[in-house]
């Protein structure tokens, strides 16, 4: 039989059972620690016991289920609101797989990143460059969608934080500042300026919060300003990231458009040598169309680049186009039908060249839409006059199209027709230019070329007015002096 070698005192055992496991208590509403204060051993023990109590309370299976249900509902509400916005105001985005994929990739990536950082305590959430979201969406899409996507993502990320209000306010303001300060991105210096402005907005707003909640400037949390600085530096990586996203999702940024619009580009240089008249027409058009697009809130850099490349197909048969002819007209040896086919082929030839030189789809769209589904009217009318009794097949004289389906394409079509027609005016007076612009654009409107694009009558009136002013300046119009009556 084994006998115990050590027996505790009954008195000690009885007394020890009365000893409390706690070594202090915290009253309801009592302040544990203030921002900027040093954590001593006593405070650490209180905070640690608070953490354990939270974990204990969250261990309940029922509570976990309810928490999960609440999170799913929370996420679902904001995703529904964002998709409703797209349906109401950007329904065309549903037809672009790359657009939706990019938006939802951002919506998934940033909340997941935030959750990992908070759960693993990797670093402060404020080093994450959330302002990169509106920059990316603004560059590839539009500012309104950029703001909506940014707010949605910030609200989804805030679910991972215990005290999200300060986070939400800081990030929403920083996003608004980023959108406003970066209306277009064509140079690296623009992004540097935006990163600086975003850092300043973070710092000023956080400083305002501290002034509101603190009564002692010595307690300011300087570490947060270091986080904001790191955030601004990381924001600069948006520039190389844009190139990667372009390739993955099939977008075209202003940076790429600026590079393409360089007239030393091999394709444009070749056009200036092979079809110099067409090249000069494209340059004039680029300035005219870009100014008009900017006036009505369109993408001026996109229109400028599209204008430079819209007629590259004329390089295949340059002599068949009047601006490249020098006294000899090769159409005289062709029938009207054959001539029409040669003229129409500059669209298909242009698309082939664009494909060969890897031009973006948005530029190819300008090539295919700048004549829409219009007729080669000169040859069609000439053929019709020679064969008045014949039922003419219009498709032989019609461009393949389609008609313009964006505001920028509509502006390009108007600029193309007006600039080309203005060269044939017998005299350049204010009246002749005004009449020409009105006649050409009113005819395009009446024939339904712009029915499929989101351009308004107000936009068209603005474009007409700008074209008149620009053409008057280009051709140095003079006032027509009245004749003296006898």
Task: List where the protein language model places each region.
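Single conserved hydrophobic/aromatic residue that forms the stacking wall/gate
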Residues: 1-8, 13
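Hydrophobic alpha-helical transmembrane segments
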Residues: 10, 14-26, 42-53, 120, ...
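Non-cytosolic juxtamembrane linkers/loops
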Residues: 17-112, 120, 130
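Charge-dense polyanion-binding interfaces
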Residues: 60-77, 161-177, 432-461
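Generic detector of multi-pass transmembrane helix bundles and their immediately adjacent loops
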Residues: 88-283
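A glycine-rich phosphate-binding loop feature that marks nucleotide/adenosyl-phosphate handling sites
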Residues: 193-200, 222, 226-227, 262-263, ...
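In a subset of proteins, long, contiguous C-terminal domains/tails are tracked
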Residues: 214-218, 222, 240, 245-249, ...
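Divalent metal-dependent catalytic cores for phosphoryl transfer on phosphate-bearing substrates
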Residues: 263-430, 434, 443-447
């Amino acid at each position: 039989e084994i006998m115990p070698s050590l027996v505790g005192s009954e008195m000690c055992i009885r007394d020890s059972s009365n000893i409390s496991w706690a070594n202090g208590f915290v009253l309801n509403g009592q302040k544990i620690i203030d921002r900027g204060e040093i954590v001593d051993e006593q405070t650490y023990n209180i905070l640690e016991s608070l953490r354990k109590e939270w974990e204990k309370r969250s261990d309940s299976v029922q509570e976990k289920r309810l928490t999960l249900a609440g999170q799913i509902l929370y996420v679902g509400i904001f995703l529904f609101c964002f998709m409703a916005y797209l349906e109401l105001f950007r329904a065309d985005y549903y037809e672009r797989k790359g657009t939706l994929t990019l938006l939802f990739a951002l919506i998934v990536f940033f909340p997941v990143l935030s959750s990992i950082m908070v759960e693993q305590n990797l670093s402060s959430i404020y080093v994450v460059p959330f302002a990169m979201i509106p920059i990316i969406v603004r560059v590839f899409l539009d500012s309104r969608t950029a703001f909506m996507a940014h707010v949605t993502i910030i609200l989804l990320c805030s679910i991972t934080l215990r005290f999200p209000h300060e986070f939400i306010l800081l990030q929403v303001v920083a996003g608004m500042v980023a959108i406003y300060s970066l209306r277009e991105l064509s140079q690296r210096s623009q992004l540097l300026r935006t990163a600086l402005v975003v850092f300043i907005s973070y710092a000023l707003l956080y400083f305002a919060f501290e002034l509101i909640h603190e009564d002692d400037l010595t307690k300011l949390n300087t570490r947060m300003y270091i986080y904001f600085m790191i955030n601004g530096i990381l924001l600069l990586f948006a520039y190389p990231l844009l190139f990667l996203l372009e390739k993955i999702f099939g977008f075209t940024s202003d940076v790429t458009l600026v590079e393409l619009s360089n007239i030393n580009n091999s394709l444009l240089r070749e056009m200036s040598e092979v079809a110099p008249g067409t090249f000069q027409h494209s340059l004039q058009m680029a300035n005219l169309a870009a100014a008009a697009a900017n006036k009505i809130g369109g993408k001026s850099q996109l229109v400028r680049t599209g204008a430079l490349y819209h007629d590259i197909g004329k390089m295949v048969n340059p002599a068949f186009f009047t601006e490249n002819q020098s006294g000899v007209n090769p159409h005289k040896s062709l029938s009207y039908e054959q001539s029409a086919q040669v003229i129409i082929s500059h669209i298909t030839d242009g698309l082939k060249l664009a494909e060969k030189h890897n031009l973006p789809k948005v530029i190819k769209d300008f090539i295919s839409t700048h004549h829409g589904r219009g007729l080669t009217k000169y040859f069609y009318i000439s053929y019709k006059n020679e064969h008045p009794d014949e039922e003419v097949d219009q498709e032989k004289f019609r461009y393949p199209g389609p008609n313009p389906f964006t505001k920028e394409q509509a502006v390009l079509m108007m600029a193309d027709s007006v600039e080309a027609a203005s060269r044939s005016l017998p005299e350049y007076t204010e009246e002749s230019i005004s009449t020409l612009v009105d006649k050409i654009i009113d005819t395009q409107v009446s024939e339904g070329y712009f029915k499929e694009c989101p351009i308004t009558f107000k936009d068209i009136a603005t474009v007409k007015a700008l074209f008149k002013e620009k053409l008057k300046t280009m051709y140095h119009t003079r006032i027509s002096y009245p004749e003296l009556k006898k």
